[in-house]
Amino acid sequence: LTDAPQPVRLVTCSTAPNPRRVNAFLIEKGVEIPKEEIDLATRAHYDPAHLDKFGTHHLPALELSDGSTLTETMAICRYLEALHPEPNLMGATPLELGRIDQWNRRVEFMIMLPAAYVFRHSHPAMATLEVQEPVMSEWHRRPLAKGLEVVEARLRASPFLAGDRFTMADINAYIALDFMRVTKTRVPEDHTATLAWQASLADRPSLQRYVPPAA
């Protein structure tokens, strides 16, 4: 795909979970893209010029060499996988493609989404960005707990979420579980398979938390 438009700029906030997922993907691929870091508190991603360029405030946002753009985490990763097929992270066989997508979706809807609702409606840092409803926070803790049970059951049967090797599904799940810390939610102690899986990945360079450079 040498004639395909190439990435020229990634607008991101590397401390946030969705940008972290793309960053992890890039590190696993050994690919570097120039980054423009945004502080979410400044709301620079709501600037009219940004919205006109990308069509949404969602981060990360990828600009390509022909001027076209991509947003949404998995869309960006799928494009990058097509440009850089190895190491494969999104599926090498039809069944693996399906399983990785299946677990990506389960993690997003059963862990990442409810954790985001808990965070947005309970964390003091979000009070200036969200009309907080405490009942929303408490309600979403229940599906979040169920999502953790689903992941635990899978990891008791498989070394990784989508099978016998590390894939994008594991990147998504690891970062989703790490994001839960801001909601004061932890993986239960009796979820031994999940805790062992987390420990096995904890030193992986791609999964380290981003530390902003000192001012």
Model-predicted segments: where are they?
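GST-like fold's C-terminal all-alpha helical module
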Residues: 2-3, 104-203
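Terminal-tail/helix-coil boundary detector
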Residues: 210-215
